[in-house]
């Protein structure tokens, strides 16, 4: 759970800046509500922590089909709601972080690949 992980990272490692990506939400409104609720709790119990909203990934049936096929949803169903959200996330991260290249860790590697796909697609349009 995001709150538990944030507590560990803040209290044990001094990390104060976080991005929240709401996953498996009904829509953007629900994603923002998750962010607002978490922000209120964090502001109350973890002073000095900053959470930015990175967006949301909505639940859609095509996402599950991609998982079943063992293919990234963005490849097999590029126009699905979740694929559009992944592209929006990649654009957000590119704008936020410029052209920094992740150098370590599996999550950084995944995000780098996701951002590269988004760059290639935006150039093709």
Question: For the regions a protein language model found, what residue spans apply to each?
Answer:
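Conserved C-terminal guanine-recognition region of P-loop GTPase G domains, centered on the G4
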Residues: 1-18
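C-terminal lobe/tail of nucleotide-utilizing enzymes
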Residues: 16-125
């Amino acid at each position: 759970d995001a709150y538990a992980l944030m507590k560990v990272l803040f209290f044990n490692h001094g990390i104060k800046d976080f991005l929240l990506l709401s996953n498996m939400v009904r829509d953007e409104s629900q994603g923002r509500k998750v962010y607002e609720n978490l922000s209120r709790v964090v502001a109350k119990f973890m002073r000095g922590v900053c959470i930015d909203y990175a967006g949301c990934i909505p639940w859609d049936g095509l996402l599950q089909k991609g998982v079943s096929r063992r293919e990234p949803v963005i490849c097999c169903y590029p126009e699905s709601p979740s694929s559009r959200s992944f592209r929006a996330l990649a654009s957000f991260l590119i704008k936020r972080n410029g052209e920094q290249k992740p150098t370590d860790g599996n999550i950084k590697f995944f995000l780098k690949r996701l951002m590269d796909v988004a760059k290639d697609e935006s150039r093709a349009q």
